[in-house]
């Protein structure tokens, strides 16, 4: 199949860019962008490669994405080696095909076609690409955004190429994401022999009523844009492994995915009040990995909806479900942020794949969005 989008996707898949190793992917993209007049600024931090590229001036539409991928798992279970892209029955197989090397290829080819037709476009077209989205994300998009904000860089619209679609390209567009807050809680007791409980203080017994009340809380009811806030216990550990020792500590890790109805400070205050109510001795550590954000109907959402309707003849759902993405960092710049990408049914799985025709369609959608906002 001879198609510039498919060919570029295959070239990217062949580079085993396990996070945060870029494995040469960005050099490939940079060469293509510089060839059509983009200025490219490499913005590497620690072990992570990033770049910021732009062409033109004025209102800015940025395309954001990541070159890194998650490990393939057991390569023997793949129908073909995970870093050897293969097309079978119209499906392109390979690690990163859907998340998100196909999107990157579609973005770059769309930019090439757009610039060829609009060499003197009125707005500024930009790219923000990182090699660490799948792992810690500490030195990726967040650091680039901080650097851009420090010099008052303008960013009006941002399209993130995360695989947002469920069954067909564009059936779901993400116009926001929930916040994510993790609590690492240690309940302190006194270790001792199970036969002498009066000489010990069992933190598991102490914490049970607290945890029972915690999991029963209805944090909010959500709103028209966000589902209700959810809290899930992810890890719980206590004990020495012996059946005759009362543990001295209980560790509990729980995560909140929260809507715009709450702030992280409101959640923290309620948890701490509950700990005090149950008179627990505790140590607590919080990790806020992202605030909730929402892009209401406006020029970017309208342009994305228009592109999907034009090429796929469907009206996309605007949703804020799912995990976090790098859009949470970009939203800090005051930009309208929307995610549009391929079908996500196989992301992070063995035999990750994407419909090759979908990537061609995605490139046309991206180009139409460019034409509506910065032509």
UniProtKB/Swiss-Prot annotation:
Disulfide bonds: none annotated. Its cofactor is Zn(2+); Co(2+). The keyword ATP-binding does not apply. The active site is at residues 68, 133. It comes from the Bacteria. Keywords: Amino-acid biosynthesis, Cobalt, Diaminopimelate biosynthesis, Hydrolase, Lysine biosynthesis, Metal-binding, Zinc. Zn(2+) 2 binds at residues 99, 134, 348. NCBIfam families: dapE_proteo, PRK13009.1. The lineage of its organism: Bacteria, Pseudomonadati, Pseudomonadota, Gammaproteobacteria, Enterobacterales. One of its GO terms (biological process) is lysine biosynthetic process via diaminopimelate. It is an enzyme of class 3 (hydrolase). This is Succinyl-diaminopimelate desuccinylase. It comes from Shigella sonnei (strain Ss046).
